[in-house]
A protein has these predicted regions:
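RNA-binding basic/glycine-rich loop and surface signature characteristic of RAMP-family CRISPR effectors
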Residues: 1-336
Length: 336
């Protein structure tokens, strides 16, 4: 059995420019700042890159949960972290790659247990161009342009609980996490090694804490570009959390555009939960900020009254209630 947390989030971006692409070489002037966007057919969908979301998440974990972050080293045109997931929380959760000298152990990599999609607009729309001037000087004002949008962004993430705090010496890309110096440190700090598989495991309380911190940070995620003139709360306004046996993300197709609005398709959500009920390891937790998609409340209340196959239920509340109730299940999920 593999144990994976799957999460779905919506971020309200009513007047925002959260991730910019810079100037476009084809623009008529060189002082237009474009937002990141993709095209599907004739429609344009603004987005926030997956890397930007990870940066916000990591920054929140450092500031609110006092995570010890791996220092960045730079050599010529490459940059890398310390590649020490025992000492640094983020090297464990966010992964790393570092090319050491052969005598030091060679190249080590770690696939991140935390995976996420970009935040992509549910609604197809063309960003608005806003004109401004720099006029706090003598002489002619300097004009400039930038884009912003009004939409709802959707995102997915998963957290591989089996991989958190577990490191391998295997010669396999993505799984050779350890090098001689790190193995010495692991032995000194009492990590348990399985000689047959070459697997080192951190104490379970450390693994559980890291998993809980990652999830508990959700209601507090902050960040984004253009906040001085397009102030936006980027913490999720809608969230779904569950743990499943498997790695596929079952919540990918539960939102859509309808009459120019972003909606949650509760029938699609119900169908996918029933179809994959044999994979559910926990109840399903839905959190929503009041004032956001209030029209969903009757449908969500109806879902919470229905028992899924296997006696799994859908539970709903505020964002923080849903996150706290779900993280209370992490310790049980991560029992040895």
């Amino acid at each position: 059995m593999s144990k994976t947390v799957v999460g779905f989030i919506l971020v309200d971006a009513p007047h925002s420019a959260l991730n910019n692409a810079g100037a476009d070489a084809g623009d008529r002037t060189d002082n237009i700042v474009r937002v990141k966007s993709i095209r599907r057919g004739r429609k344009v969908y603004p987005y926030v890159s997956g890397q930007a979301l990870r940066y916000w998440w990591r920054d929140t974990l450092e500031k609110k949960y006092d995570w010890k972050m791996s220092p960045i080293e730079r050599q010529k045109k490459i940059a890398f972290t310390s590649a020490n997931p025992i000492k640094y929380d983020d090297d464990d959760v966010f992964g790393y790659m570092r090319a050491l000298k052969a005598k030091e152990g060679g190249t080590v990599t770690r696939i991140s247990p935390l995976k996420n999609s970009p935040l992509i607009s549910v609604i197809g729309q063309t960003p608005t161009q806003d004109f401004g001037v720099m006029a706090r000087h003598e002489g002619d004002p300097v004009p400039y342009e930038h884009e912003f949008y009004s939409t709802v962004l959707k995102g997915l993430f998963s957290l591989d609980l089996d991989s958190l705090g577990v490191f391998y010496t295997n010669e396999k890309t993505g799984y050779r996490n350890m090098y001689p110096q790190l193995e010495e440190e692991a032995e000194e700090k009492g990590l348990v090694k399985d000689e047959e598989s070459g697997k080192w495991s951190m104490p379970n309380d450390t693994r559980i804490k890291r998993a809980k911190d990652v999830l508990k940070a959700l209601p507090y995620i902050q960040g984004g570009a253009k906040q001085t003139s397009h102030l936006t709360d980027v913490s999720p306004k809608f969230v779904i959390l569950a743990a499943i046996d498997g790695g596929n993300h079952i919540f990918m197709n539960i939102t859509k555009e309808e009459d120019g609005d972003a909606i949650i398709d509760t029938e699609a959500l119900k169908d996918v939960l029933i179809e994959y009920s044999d994979c559910l390891l926990t109840d399903v937790y839905i959190g929503r900020r009041k004032g956001f998609m209030d029209n969903l409340e009757p449908n969500i209340n109806k879902l919470t009254e229905e028992i899924l196959i296997g006696n799994r239920k859908i539970k709903s509340g505020s964002i923080k209630e849903a996150v706290d109730q779900f993280t209370d299940k992490i310790e049980e999920l991560m029992k040895p």
